[in-house]
Amino acid sequence: MELEKEMKYWKWTKQIRRISGILLLMLSVCALSRQTAFAEENQEVVDIPGLVYDHSMELVYAEEFSVDYYKEGYALIRIHQGEETFLVVPEGKEVPDNLDSNITVLQQPINHIYLVATSAMDLFRAIDGIDSIRLSGTKEDGWYIPEAKEAMENGAMLYAGKYSAPDYEEILSEQCDLAIESTMIYHNPEVKEKLEQLGIPVLVERSSYESHPLGRTEWMKLYAVLLGKEEAAETAFEEQAEKLEALSSEENTGKTVAFFYINSTGAVNVRKSHDYVSKMIELAGGVYVPEDAGSDDNALSTMNMQMEEFYAKAKNADYLIYNSAIDGELESID
């Protein structure tokens, strides 16, 4: 069958690995020239009793968070236009009186983090902050980042359960001072509520909602605020900016690329055309297909297609990249 022959072609070649390498490089690239004055344009400065506003963090691409700095080292983090708000209090400083009940206090040092949002680990690595992560929501064999695997091997980082089933006893015994979750936690709101009842602040990171891949990378600046590593984050950001500048002179190859996986129902899950993966392909000099994927306005970054429709739109793609990170590798066409 022609379909079977085409599916066999999906066993990736050296060319696939080459373009995948380019895409991985783009994951860590973080700068161009566009400025996003998120805090200044979209939100007013919060008046906190006893604190004096100083300045706001300058962000290049990230649109899902903002940081306002106050005198004496205080910092206010707002996520998703203030849906979640955190006040980072420097070590040795007092929590302001009469603080709004919607503001969660994060007292530095923050060095017993329960990291459930796996995508954040590489950003912590970039700012030399993995030592501040005591608990992991991913087992040792699930990490591809050497520093994370090593930390779990030597006991510096412990497994404390996945997002839907955390080990509360372990989390409490390790004096966890912050849980960083992905938006998957909203599927189990009782877990977030329980952690907060136990006195553990929960920060839900939304880097996956950034429309530009560089916006995702810029979340390292938020984590740097937690750890007091802003200079390290700025340095890492600038280093990646130089890499992008070198790549920006490359001409568009015109090569078409499909990025997908087959879900448990047999449907093909693809990235929408506005998603960060689609943007990475564009930045790497390619053209994402299907080009018309996801013209609707909902916030989801992926969509499902029937196999026949996907085949019709992607059969002539120059490169087919299978996303095995979700449901594993494709072993057969059955």
Task: Indicate where each model-derived feature is located.
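Bacterial Sec-exported substrate-binding components of ABC uptake systems
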Residues: 34-121, 232-259
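Flexible, glycine-rich surface segments
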Residues: 249-333
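Extracytoplasmic substrate-binding proteins
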Residues: 156, 169, 173, 177-267, ...
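A short, structured surface patch at a secondary-structure boundary
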Residues: 75-172, 178-184
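N-terminal secretory signal peptides that target proteins for export/translocation
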Residues: 1-15
